[in-house]
Curated annotation (Swiss-Prot):
Component of the oligosaccharyltransferase (OST) complex. It comes from Caenorhabditis elegans. Subunit of the oligosaccharyl transferase (OST) complex that catalyzes the initial transfer of a defined glycan (Glc(3)Man(9)GlcNAc(2) in eukaryotes) from the lipid carrier dolichol-pyrophosphate to an asparagine residue within an Asn-X-Ser/Thr consensus motif in nascent polypeptide chains, the first step in protein N-glycosylation. N-glycosylation occurs cotranslationally and the complex associates with the Sec61 complex at the channel-forming translocon complex that mediates protein translocation across the endoplasmic reticulum (ER). All subunits are required for a maximal enzyme activity. The gene is ostd-1. It is a multi-pass membrane protein. Disruption phenotype: RNAi-mediated knock-down is mostly embryonic lethal. Embryogenesis proceeds more slowly and embryos are osmo-sensitive. Twenty-five percent of embryos exhibit cytokinesis defects. Sixty-five percent of embryos have incorrectly positioned cleavage furrows. Other phenotypes include delayed chromosome alignment at metaphase and disrupted endoplasmic reticulum morphology. Residues 209-222, 266-280 are cytoplasmic. Its main location: endoplasmic reticulum. It is found in: Endoplasmic reticulum membrane. This is Dolichyl-diphosphooligosaccharide--protein glycosyltransferase subunit 2. Keywords: Endoplasmic reticulum, Membrane, Signal, Transmembrane, Transmembrane helix. The lineage of its organism: Eukaryota, Metazoa, Ecdysozoa, Nematoda, Chromadorea.
Length: 280
């Protein structure tokens, strides 16, 4: 089945490729940006002939080329698969652009040279312009140089990478905005909070003054002064936490001093209990 399809394709191509083609109504010219094409500003060129004078254009002008492709046998218009304009620079580099037909089968290339320069890879100066026409059904492919053009195309410079750019100019002044201090409460609220925090100690001092402190029943033990010194030290740690220490430093000192005060207090209570048992 595949072999049959291949043979049918070859046969159809062989039968189709029986006609020669010709390029008719070939016109070329340089137009201004908003100028309409007409017989006055376009030159007609016969197939396989060449314009005697060189075309000259700058980047603001348009290159206009129009033509039709028809069979020689019946002059019917055809649309070959490959229709190109080829621009060959003096250094041998070439640029090939596609020419597409309109709905009526007419081929038109109309482009501002500044826009076309993007595809010319920074080429500028003199070019040889050729028309290329080809198709599997065409017996005589066309490669026709019909004109020379001197085009002053703009050179598209490649941008310098940002890492390689050097700017000799003063830099903007760096201004640092410091964080605004947080709004603190009024002095009245601060004093009231301090009094509330110190109120348990004040109440303790008042109650001690009313009840009285009896040092006569204190046992003769070295743990007694250690216990009282530990209590005073704990109050001192609280005070330092208030003015300087953070929570972690406070807990570190409080763990050591609190354990020592706890042991000393336990020993004092045991000594008091033993002295009471002896007195009874």
């Amino acid at each position: 089945m595949k072999l049959l399809l291949v043979l049918l394709t070859i046969a159809s191509v062989a039968l189709a490729a029986v006609d020669d083609v010709a390029v008719n109504n070939f016109k070329v010219g340089i137009l201004a940006k908003d100028q309409q094409p007409s017989d006055e500003n376009l030159k007609t060129v016969a197939l396989f002939s060449k314009l005697p004078n060189e075309l000259k254009a700058d980047a603001s002008q348009r290159l206009y080329v129009s033509f039709t492709v028809a069979k020689k046998s019946d002059n019917a218009k055809v649309k070959p698969h490959q229709v190109f304009l080829r621009f060959v620079a003096q250094n041998g580099e070439d640029v090939v652009v596609v020419v597409n037909p309109d709905a009526n089968g007419n081929y038109v290339y109309d482009n501002v040279l500044r826009t076309a320069a993007k595809s010319f890879r920074n080429l500028s100066g003199q070019f040889k312009i050729s028309l290329l026409v080809g198709d599997v059904t065409i017996k005589n492919p066309i490669n026709w140089q019909f004109a020379n053009i001197d085009a002053a195309l703009p050179v598209a410079y490649e941008p310098t990478p940002k890492s390689q750019q050097v700017h000799f100019e003063p830099l903007n002044e760096i201004s640092h905005i410091f964080r605004q201090p947080e709004k603190r409460p009024s002095a009245l609220i601060s004093d009231l909070f301090t009094i509330i925090c110190l109120s348990p100690l004040l109440i303790l001092v008042v109650l001690w003054s009313q009840v009285g402190i009896n040092f006569q029943n204190a046992p003769a033990s070295p743990w007694v002064p250690i216990f009282h010194v530990g209590l005073i030290g704990i109050f001192g740690i609280y005070f330092m936490f208030w003015v300087q220490f953070d929570m972690f430093v406070t807990l570190k000192y409080l763990a050591v001093l609190g354990f020592l005060t706890f042991v000393a207090g336990n020993r004092v209570l045991r000594a008091i209990s033993e002295s009471k048992q002896k007195s009874e």
